[in-house]
Amino acid sequence: MRILVKISYQGSNFLGFQIQQHGRTVQQQFEKILKRMHKRHVRIHPSSRTDRGVHAIEQYFHFDTELNIAPDKWQYAMNSALPDDIYVNEVSIVDDDFHCRYDCVGKRYRYKVYQGKHRDVFMSGLKTFYADSLDLEKMNEAAQQFIGTHDFTGFCSQKTEVESKERTLYQSEIIKTENGFDYIVTGSGFLYNMVRVLVAFLIEVGKGKRQPEEVPILLEAKDRKQVPFTAPAEGLYLEKIYLAPQELINDFGPDIKIHRKKSLEND
């Protein structure tokens, strides 16, 4: 039986989602619980492998089990054993051929920035602080130019190891907030550090150091050295996982390009 689990977590005190040889991870927390229940190792398969310090409002994973436990009982058992910075929102039974990575057709991230004269210690780990004044209109103009299907070689970590660095973005926009801004980006998938590199570039645009007109040129150049900065992990939230094409169509219309996963991605 295949079980699908929908979770949220505050990522400040995790080394990321994926299991690490030394250190606290989200995967480690769940596999420890499942091992105790099954008396053997049970591997979980996530929709996304978030990095150290990255939060998740909506994240999924699946696992296989022979235990005859109702979904609500799974939820109760896990939440009873989990630390305060992880929560199971929902558990369901899915078809045996369902896969959290391969059936994921899209993801939405939100990057939160607050501004002001002074850093707020109570925002530490939850939002990124920038004291500089930023031109949000120009930032949004630049952000819009990332929408569509592009090769994002110049906007990801040089450690990215995938055959194709082409991704489709359905949404890329700057939203003004009460004390700063959010960057919201929805796409077919994301390369390693891609969202954080996009944010760092947009902030450079906001400072007047780069121009929106440079986006097509930089995409064509495919040279990370021309976009050298990466925004901090704090402030980055995995906000939504799209597990069905219809969900994407509902949000972005019937004419969008939908990608089916054939191999594992960096995120």
UniProtKB/Swiss-Prot annotation:
Single GO molecular function: RNA binding
Keyword flag tRNA processing: yes
SUPFAM superfamilies per record: Pseudouridine synthase
Gene3D superfamilies for the chain: Pseudouridine synthase I, catalytic domain, C-terminal subdomain, Pseudouridine synthase I, catalytic domain, N-terminal subdomain
Assigned EC number: 5.4.99.12
Signal peptide start-end: none
Residues that span the membrane, as ranges: none
UniProt GO BP: tRNA pseudouridine synthesis
Keyword terms, alphabetized: Isomerase, tRNA processing
InterPro entries to which the protein is assigned, alphabetical: PsdUridine_synth_cat_dom_sf, PsdUridine_synth_TruA, PsdUridine_synth_TruA_a/b_dom, PsdUridine_synth_TruA_C, TruA/RsuA/RluB/E/F_N
Catalytic activity as recorded in UniProt: uridine(38/39/40) in tRNA = pseudouridine(38/39/40) in tRNA
Residues the record lists as binding substrate: 109
Active-site positions on this chain: 51
Family: Belongs to the tRNA pseudouridine synthase TruA family.
Function: Formation of pseudouridine at positions 38, 39 and 40 in the anticodon stem and loop of transfer RNAs.
NCBIfam families, A to Z: hisT_truA
Subunit structure: Homodimer.
The name this protein goes by in its record: tRNA pseudouridine synthase A
Organism encoding this protein: Staphylococcus carnosus (strain TM300)
